[in-house]
Amino acid sequence: IGDGTYNHSGLMSIRAAVSSQTSITYKILFNDAVAMTGGQGHDGDIEALDIVKELQAIGVSKVVGIYDEKEDLPLSQFNTVIDIYPRDQLIEIQNELAKIEGVTALVYIQTCAAEKRRRRKRGTFLDPDKRIFINPEVCEGCGDCGIQSNCVAILPKETSLGRKRQIDQSSCNKDFSCVDGFCPSFVSIEGAVLKKTLPGELIVPFIESPQIPAIKNTFNLVITGVGGTGIVTIGALLAMAAHLEGKGVGVMEMAGLAQKGGAVHIHCRIASRPAEISAIRVAFEEANSLIGGDLMVTAGEKTLSLLKRNRTKVVCAQNEANAGEFTLDRDFTLPTDRMRLAISSKVGSKNVALITGEEKII
């Protein structure tokens, strides 16, 4: 369980297990953020050491700590209370705990990666002055770097010599566990910084204002994409624009920190008057329009169920984004053609516009 869940309800289940003399091992992740609802701090400013002492106080037979070596932990304080080990010993330690009768607990201490990025931007968290690159001339595409790190910042790189690996520097959280892979292709560069793209001159041609038809009942808009790419912002901007025009609008957003990198759906309903908005969620086959920021999320069953042939108009970016499955399957390839077909089959090819967007990152 996470530290937020532990704080508001998880402790009660552990107490019940102790009371019933159950043999069970709890793994508690202390990532220093309530990730499900936006990355807030914990009520009462609870710390990892507080959790350890509380577990011991309620009668947990053995508590062990696992920590990320890059965390700024007061190890001397922990060592006087429990045994604490580096994270590479996780499997060994949890197997030992599983053999102990009664309730045991493993407290894993590692700050949430998304929260690290936030704090580094604010200068409140250590930012290593180093970046890791993969030399494609040496890489053989074995995928051991992904096995060791389970990291979505490792991307496939298709070459004339086959599939290699590359590191997406914009999503790398500087965990560096990828270098534990049995591979000589890694290059560590100290002092490297990402290139900042210079603001370009935006030339917008004259566009006549469209004739907007009157809204009958509600206009139902669905926006899909990957968390952390501005999908929630698009929904908020459209909702505010409708509000400023005096229209009624209801928007349902997935804004939790845990959505970063995952599928995000925004439901936005617009009406002539606020009183005409009776429900926020767009129901089965009721979407009038869909803006897709990612092909994989848009072609998912959850999204397709909202679309209807000859009713829904779809505009979707068809750039391929790496999926989490690639960390487990080195040969994984997105079924892009099948995803395009799924969308066009649902609403009709005349109602789909697939576009390609380009972005400079480094």
Q: Predicted segment positions?
A:
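Short beta-alpha connecting loops at secondary-structure transitions
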Residues: 33-47, 74-82, 124-137, 159-170, ...
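Short acidic, glycine/serine/threonine-rich loops at helix termini
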Residues: 9-13, 36-42, 74-80, 116-122, ...
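Thiamine diphosphate
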Residues: 1-104
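Iron-sulfur cluster-binding cysteine motifs and their immediate structural context
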Residues: 110-111, 116-122, 140-197
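Glycine-rich beta-alpha junction loops
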Residues: 31-33, 69-71, 109-114, 318-321, ...
